């Protein structure tokens, strides 16, 4: 039977991608249905209890700038906040927060349940309703059918998921949850390329059995950072330390002596695991010269005794896991409360998606999260928001939207996936972006909030706060430009005390701030340039914009040159065998990837600058050279 009311958008899955997709579609005014196998696990942190990090924190800030949920949730649930790379330049600084799993899940669920236009329904999905290559609904486990104009798949590791502990394995979507086998089979019937990936998680330890007195503590930053542009540190719950231990030669001997019982090394697991979050088995074998690896003992929450040992993800048998854990300092008597495991699951080739994350083959069907080959909550959330907003736009008969690589890390993520695909779980790093000086955490709102408002994602409160910040930045920059000090002025001695070389000519506040030794806080502590802005976010922007003005202008020039290639469109139906002068390798790669633009084509491995030149000449001769607005 069909449910009595149709929906505009259906989201299948309530993880980090699904919750952002549902919130985005509903915020845009579309009637949205979120289908999940268990309402109690909405926003569940399946692996590490943390949000953010290098590249990942940038994505969280971008999701927040577009009105998303993740940053607000972690501000309410974070039990330790730190700025990584704090001593480096602003482009690579990143926020990371340890999370209380329960508080995080509660924050997400509360937001979902109070979001207008959103209905949550507990049922596993077993089938899609596809008519004439167009998705029109979904079928649940009990046979109830829902109709919609667009469907977003955010099913994580549940598609034909298989959990491995040693040489034993069983079906599961994650520990304690069933897999989605009927939906996996249905998707394999569609004209989509499917493969298997693998990820893993470490055993969880009972904190009462760890001797923390012999371990180094790691505290959060003070003052505490904040994730959301709308947040403040007063929202953070109680803060707690993490602890550090290390593996040693005894640990490594245990692992080496039991590799024959590892499902990865025994050939039982076929899926490829994450390169940048390897299992402890992989680390010991790949870095054989290392006699120790640092392990962070991270609390799972304020009311939980569970500890997450970050760095010993493993699928070795339980008895070996016990030996590994107890070989480390402070853990000699430790008890495991949940075994570590590896999980294999289906993922679908993201090269079969448009940059909006809609399938090229099934109209109205969108994919987001681990189903696209990514790893990490943050990557999933960013994709979920993009897929949700585009599903909403499609259901309203509007064109899709995707950010450019020069506009957001989300643009880098989607372009990498849709252009290059992936053969291993993809995670975001700042090094993946060509224009990372422009794509900083601190300016995510300046880059994206205006577009978020146009798309219908940004509410009135956020929009008012954003415009107030813009006004504060502009007013303060004008004040510093127009405030001067001369070498002979009474205030010159006070200014010179902060400079490595004294004033030799008249200087404005901006001139002084450009000097590497002068900070905004120091400058505005001087009588001639006081007072400082009360808006800390605006003050940070003033300092960065002034100090890096020349570098930013240079990178903006590079972006404008590259936009010419990005805006030169390639016909979707072009058979590159028609283009004389291209090598067989280039023809095969272009026909396989079907890039949407010259810019995308140039990023495909093996497509040389010479091939791009040949392609441009051929397009011009054929009268097919088109540029987007």
Curated annotation (Swiss-Prot):
Family annotation (InterPro entries): FAD/NAD-bd_sf, GIDA_C_N, MnmG, MnmG-rel, MnmG-rel_CS, MnmG_C, MnmG_C_subdom, MnmG_C_subdom_sf
Residues engaged in binding NAD(+): 273-287
Quaternary structure annotation from Swiss-Prot or TrEMBL: Homodimer. Heterotetramer of two MnmE and two MnmG subunits.
Native organism: Salmonella typhimurium (strain LT2 / SGSC1412 / ATCC 700720)
One of the record's GO molecular function terms: flavin adenine dinucleotide binding
Major localisation: cytoplasm
Superkingdom field: Bacteria
Taxon lineage: Bacteria, Pseudomonadati, Pseudomonadota, Gammaproteobacteria, Enterobacterales
Similarity annotation: Belongs to the MnmG family.
PANTHER family in the record: GLUCOSE INHIBITED DIVISION PROTEIN A (PTHR11806), PROTEIN MTO1 HOMOLOG, MITOCHONDRIAL (PTHR11806:SF0)
HAMAP family in UniProt: MnmG_GidA
Entry protein name: tRNA uridine 5-carboxymethylaminomethyl modification enzyme MnmG
Keyword Chloroplast: no
Chain coiled-coil ranges: none
Function field: NAD-binding protein involved in the addition of a carboxymethylaminomethyl (cmnm) group at the wobble position (U34) of certain tRNAs, forming tRNA-cmnm(5)s(2)U34.
One GO cellular component, as annotated: cytosol
Alphabetized UniProt keyword annotations: Cytoplasm, FAD, Flavoprotein, NAD, tRNA processing
Subcellular location: Cytoplasm
UniProt keyword Methyltransferase, yes or no: no
Co-factor requirement: FAD
């Amino acid at each position: 039977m069909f449910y009595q009311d149709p929906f505009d958008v259906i989201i299948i899955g309530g993880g980090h991608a699904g919750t952002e997709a549902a919130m985005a579609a509903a915020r845009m005014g579309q009637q949205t249905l979120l289908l999940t196998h268990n309402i109690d696990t909405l926003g569940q942190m399946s692996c590490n209890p943390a949000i953010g990090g290098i590249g990942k924190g940038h994505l969280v800030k971008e999701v927040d700038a577009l009105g998303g949920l993740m940053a607000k949730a972690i501000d309410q649930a974070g039990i330790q906040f730190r700025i990584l790379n704090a001593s480096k330049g602003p482009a690579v600084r990143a926020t990371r927060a340890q999370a209380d799993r329960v508080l995080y899940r509660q924050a997400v669920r509360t937001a979902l349940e109070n979001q207008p236009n959103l209905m949550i329904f507990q049922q596993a999905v077993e089938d899609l309703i596809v008519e004439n290559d167009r998705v029109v609904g979904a079928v649940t486990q009990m046979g109830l059918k829902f109709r919609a104009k667009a469907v977003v798949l955010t099913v994580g590791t549940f598609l034909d998921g298989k959990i491995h502990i040693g040489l034993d394995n069983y079906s599961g979507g994650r520990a304690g949850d069933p897999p989605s086998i009927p939906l996996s089979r249905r998707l394999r019937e569609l004209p989509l390329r499917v493969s298997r990936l693998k990820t893993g998680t470490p055993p969880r330890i009972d904190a009462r059995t760890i001797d923390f007195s012999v371990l180094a503590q790691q505290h959060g930053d003070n003052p505490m950072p904040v994730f959301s542009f709308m947040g403040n540190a007063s929202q953070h719950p109680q803060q707690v330390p993490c602890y550090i231990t290390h593996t040693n030669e005894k640990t490594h001997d245990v692992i080496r002596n039991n590799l024959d019982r590892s499902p990865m090394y025994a050939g039982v697991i076929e899926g490829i695991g994450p390169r940048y979050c390897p299992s402890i088995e992989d680390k010991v074998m790949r870095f054989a010269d290392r006699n120790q690896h640092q392990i962070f003992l991270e609390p799972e929450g304020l009311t939980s005794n569970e500890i997450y040992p970050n760095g010993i993800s493993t699928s070795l048998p339980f008895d070996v896991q016990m030996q590994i854990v107890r070989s480390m300092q402070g853990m000699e008597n430790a008890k495991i409360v949940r075994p570590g495991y590896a999980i294999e699951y289906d993922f679908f080739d993201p090269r079969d998606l448009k940059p909006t994350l809609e399938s090229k083959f099934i109209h109205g069907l969108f994919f987001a999260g681990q189903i696209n080959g990514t790893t990490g909550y943050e990557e999933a959330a960013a994709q979920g928001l993009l897929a949700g907003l585009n599903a909403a736009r499609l259901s309203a008969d509007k064109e899709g939207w995707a950010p450019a690589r020069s506009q957001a890390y989300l643009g880098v993520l989607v372009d990498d996936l849709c252009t290059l695909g992936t053969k291993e779980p993809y995670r975001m790093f700042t090094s993946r972006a060509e224009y990372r000086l422009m794509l900083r955490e601190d300016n995510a709102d300046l880059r994206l909030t205006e577009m978020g408002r146009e798309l219908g994602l940004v509410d009135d409160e956020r929009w008012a706060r954003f415009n107030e910040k813009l006004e504060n930045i502009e007013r303060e920059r004008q004040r510093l430009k127009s405030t001067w000090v001369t070498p002979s002025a009474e205030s010159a001695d006070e200014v010179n005390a902060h400079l490595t070389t004294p004033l030799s000519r008249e200087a404005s506040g901006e001139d002084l701030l450009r000097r590497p030794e002068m900070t905004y806080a120091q400058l505005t502590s001087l009588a001639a340039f006081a007072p400082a802005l009360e808006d800390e976010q605006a003050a940070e922007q003033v300092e960065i914009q002034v100090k890096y003005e020349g570098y930013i202008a240079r990178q903006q020039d590079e972006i404008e040159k590259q936009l010419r290639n990005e805006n030169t469109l390639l016909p979707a139906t072009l058979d590159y065998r028609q283009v004389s002068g291209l090598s067989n390798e280039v023809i095969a790669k272009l026909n396989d990837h079907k890039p949407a633009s010259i810019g995308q084509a140039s990023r495909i491995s093996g497509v040389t600058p010479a091939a791009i030149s040949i392609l441009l000449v051929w397009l011009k001769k054929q009268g097919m050279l088109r540029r987007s607005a």
